[in-house]
Amino acid sequence: MVLEIVFFTSCLILSVVGVYLNLCYLRATHRSTVYPKFTGNNLRFLSVAHIVLACSNVVAAAAMWGANVNRTTKSEAFFSTTLSVSRAIPALTVFWTTVERITYNRSPTIRESPKFRYVAVFRVIEVVVSVIMEMIIRGIYLNSDDQLKEAAGLEVLQSSNDEISIKSSLIANVYYDFYHGILFLPCIIISVLMFKSAKGSHTRACLLGGMRNDQKIQNLSGQMTFFKNSYIMLYIACLADFILHVIVKRFINLEDSTLDMMYINARCFLPIVYPLSLIANNKNLRIDYFGNFILCRKARNLHKESKVKVIATRESQESIIANLKMIGILSDVDTSQGGAGAASLAMMGMGGGGAPRPPSGGRMASISKDPNSITSSGSLAKQSTASMGSGGASGMMMFHTRPKSSVPSMGSVG
């Protein structure tokens, strides 16, 4: 009983971690340009499939802990079928990623302008093919001679009201191991051949100065980048998940109930490593991922609020100074020194390349050399000054207007 509680708690924690990591990945890749559109949509769809897998693990662990779902043939059939379907797509992550790479490489339409119907059709194919293959393999195993004899014996025991223990067909079915394991070999062979072909074509195009085929060169470069940054780590993660399942199902001899709980915990591994494998070698995606690691919008934006305010304040200061210079109200100010520096220069009469002019009689000297210009030190200073920085009175800017004779009529500032 204690061991079951430990396994259930660990399954719950691992499943929650897997769901959260995949939600962070979905948030980070929303409208992201790290991957091409078709590739990004496929990876996001696979991430959703891993979320479904993690949620099914929680439900399965709760059902196994709260009720003896593997004590009758009917309950075991429903239990195994549900778990098999929920893992149908995640178990083929490498396969569908390889198929997407082939489709992306061979189809200019998908590569250049992938419409939603292409993405939808590809997703439907993924779901239908994965589920059908899982059901076919399960049917082949259950209809074998050994399983038919075992099922007949279990029906006799069940009719006598004796408590029986049925080993889950998910664990006993060896065809699943051959089916999932044999797909890794062609996937890696096809990927290596595509990588070598893309690398050779890209090298020849660059040596021949083939910038006329710029779109093709970018496509080949994208193939190589995806293989190095994402595919290799994803392949290693999925292969490790497959090896973990084989070890749990074939090399550990425990009671059926304990082995079932260990198998459910092993299913929690893939939803965790899937998003981590995609961001491991991809620097740009890793930055976006950790930038969106806090899913709560308020909490995520809280640490950005002060930085955004500083940027907005600096841009506002530079915009105000540029507008005043453009309409001739303010003399030239070096805005490259930032808002506060420009404000201090304007206050001290150091506009443009002019030399500083000391104040006379305790009053600020005018920047303009025109004797007819008007220096507003009263109400105009109160109405037209901008506080640059946090300097209080030292943040005042002296605006020097044009002579009265050159001031245009009302309604137009010129």
From Swiss-Prot:
Supply the alphabetized keyword list.
Membrane, Transmembrane, Transmembrane helix
UniProt-annotated stretches for the region Disordered = 351-414
Membrane topology is: Multi-pass membrane protein
Q: Output the superkingdom of the source species.
A: Eukaryota
Q: Mainly resides where?
A: membrane
Any coiled-coil regions, as ranges: none
Bias (Polar residues) ranges: 369-383, 404-414
Q: Where found in the cell? A: Membrane
Q: Where is the chain membrane-spanning?
A: 1-21, 45-65, 124-144, 175-195, 232-252, 259-279, 336-356
GO cellular component term of the entry, any:
membrane
Q: Is Transcription regulation found in the keyword set? A: no
Specify the protein name. Uncharacterized protein ZK1320.5
Organism in which the protein naturally occurs: Caenorhabditis elegans
